[in-house]
Structures are given as structure tokens and as C-alpha cells.
Amino acid sequence: MHKLLKILLAGLVCLGSMVPAFADESAGVLPCTLTAENGTPVWQLSDQNRSTKLDWSGGTLTVESTEPITGLYLIWDRPPEPWTGTAGSQTLSGGEYGFLHEYFPLESPVTRAELTLPEGSRCCDVYAFGEGELPDWVQQWQPPLADADLLVLPTHADDEHLFFGGTMPYYAGELGKKVQVVYFTNHWAEPYRPHELLDGLWTVGIRNYPVMSSFVDQYADSLDYARTLYDEEEAVAWQVQQLRRFKPEVVVGHDVNGEYGHGVHMYNADTLMQALELSADPSYDPESAQKWGVWDVPKTYLHLWPENPIVMDWSQPLSAFGGKTAVEMARLGFAEHVSQQTFFKVEDYGPYDCRKFGLYRSLVGLDAQGGDFFENLAAGDYSDYLPPEPEPEPEPVSEPEPERTRTLPGWTLLAGMVGAVALAEGMILYGRRRKR
């Protein structure tokens, strides 16, 4: 009887250790073969290294695996042109929004997919995934917003974390507001930085793809010098276009002194301030007024603006991020900018304190409470854009679901073992009493 009890207990321990594995299954990267149309292996796209890339010469890329593929993930070096492909009976289409990181869930598992990529496109990696939950690092971007609650206007990739701190994790990740990020410069001359940009945004809860301007990243040590680098009329018009396109209730911009004195930060703030006075005027840039309509931003905050100051509380735990605070998430977002890990860091203290902002412009009065960019804005004032709801599919007629114990044989076995252990223990105790 003691031997039986030991066997049952051992089986119970083994079964218990298997339960977390069932609950923790996730999709892994599948081993796959990538070949060009002429049959040549394309190793550059399967090394999981963004620094190796391939200039596609045209034709079809074939992705094959011995295991069922349920999703494909493409990493581009530059925004791709539209492209198509097939995976079984499913037609794939990509490149519509120029996403550098594109994920495609497949309707049915396949072991072979064919992608017709544009000639001259430059790709870094192609991943195939199997059944299960995708890893957190796989980014499933949505297009830029048609209507934003909050527009964040950093100058460079990493400024959004360094100087705007917990803005994105708190408002986008925790509160679920529609946050659009628009960068004044681009980093195409440093091809690793756009990837870092996307990784950082994804980390802090941004899900709508960012906008990157056509202005090349350059350094200036003053506002006057920055004005020699860019066409100011073009820059102001671009700022107006962003305000009209996204129609934000709140805009967050840079310090007019450029935080640590960066002239292009100053220039971004200066052209934004000009644009705020022009975006509601239909006679200014009539082409964008015709395309998007005009817009007068209700509230604008600038980093470190001395008037009407507020100090944001980025120290509260956020349930959306497992209890991490907004400033902790900002630091994790900045950590994705591997190339920028020098002497800058996200600081919630000191001269560049990422918590400190000032209400530069308001159509709804001054803040009384402070600590919330949306103070004095009622819920009806924003989030007024709703995407069209899909037509509901008719519910299929189905048989009643079987009992849960039938669909979870492991738990049935577990319950049986527990009962057997209890019975065995009772028999042992009964035998001992009889001997006494």
C-alpha cells in the first residue's frame, strides 16, 4: 500500500509540473528555407540580423518549412512598395503603409508561401511562426490614426522617451487613448535607428505606426543655425499638415531652449508654435485644408515651459505593464535605442526632468488641478472618431459544448489521482487502527 501511495504521489507531482507548460505555450520561430525564383538560397533573410540585408532583384521569394506556418514577419530596411504573395488559398498584400516591420497572420496553416517582392526593395529578415501566442517582440502595427487624442512631436528617435518620459506608456498603454507620434526628422542615413525607434514605441504601448518626416537629421547648436539647415516655410507647413491631419485635442512638444541646447529641438518647437496659429486658417496652405480640413488645437504643452507649469506623476504603477511605472517604461523604451546609450538617460529630476511641462496654449482655460494633459477636456471633446464596425457574422448552429472534463483530460487524470491518494491514505489509517 505504501508503494502504491508513493507511485500515485510521484505521478501527481509529474502531472502538476506539466500544467504550466500547457498554459505557457507560445509560437516559436520555425526553421525554414528561403529561396529566390531561380532556386538560390537567400541566407541573408534568415540570419535574424537586421544589419545584413538583401536588395531584391525581382521575382518570387519562396518560404518553406516542414512545420505548419501560421504567420510571417518581414523586417525591411526601407519602407517597401506595395507587394503581394500567396499562402495556400490566401492572398497576401503588404507595403500599403510602408511599415518596416510587417506581420501577416495566415488564415490557415501552410508549409509554403510565395512572396512577390518589388524589384529594388531592401529586406533584412523574414520569420515564419508556428502555432501558439506570438512573442512580445513581434510588432503588429496599425496604420497612423485618422483622429488622435494626443499628438507627440519629438525631434529625433529617442527624444520621445528622454524628454516626454511617461507620456506614451501612461496615456497610450495604461489609459488607451489614441496617441500618434510624429518625428520632425528622419534617420534613414543610420539604418539601425528606425528599427530602434519602432522597438522603443512598441515597448511603451504605441500601436499606431509613427510618422517620420522628410527632414534629414542634422545637428545645430542654436536656433539661428537650425534655420539655415531647413526651409522654414516648408517646416511650418509640415507642422500645420500634422495638426490638420491628426486633429489632436492635446499636443506635446519640445522645450523652446532645446533641452540641452539642441538647435533643431528649438526649431521644432518654434515652427510648431507658428503652426498652432495657422492651422485653423483655411487660407493658409489651402491644399491641406481641402484634404483634411482646418483644426485649432485645444491644448498644447511644451516640455519645461515656465508658464502654467505642471509636474506629471510618472511614479504610479501601471496595470498595463505589470505594475511598472510610467518612468520605468520610458527607460525600457529608451533602452531599445541601443546606439544611443551614451551619457543620456531618462531623468525624472534635474534640468531636463521628463515630468515637467507647461501649458503653452489653451482654448479651454488654465489647469486647476494639474497632472493631467486632458484636464478641462470632457470625454465628448475627444475620441470622436470611431472606425466602421464590421458586419456581424451569423452565428453558426453548433452542438452543445461537451463537458469541460472531457476537453481537459489532464485535469480529469489529476482529479482521479487526488482521489486515489485520499483513498489510499484512508486505507492506511484504517489498517493502523485495526492493528491497535
Regions found by a protein language model. Give the residues of each.
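Hydrophobic core
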Residues: 13-17, 423
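Residues in and immediately flanking transmembrane alpha helices
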Residues: 16-19, 169-171
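Short, intrinsically disordered, low-complexity terminal segments
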Residues: 7, 20, 417-419
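Active-site beta-strand->loop->alpha-helix modules in alpha/beta enzyme cores, enriched
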Residues: 27-61, 65-285
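Sec-dependent signal peptide recognition
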Residues: 2-10
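Sec-dependent signal peptide cleavage junction
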Residues: 17-26, 403-411, 429-433
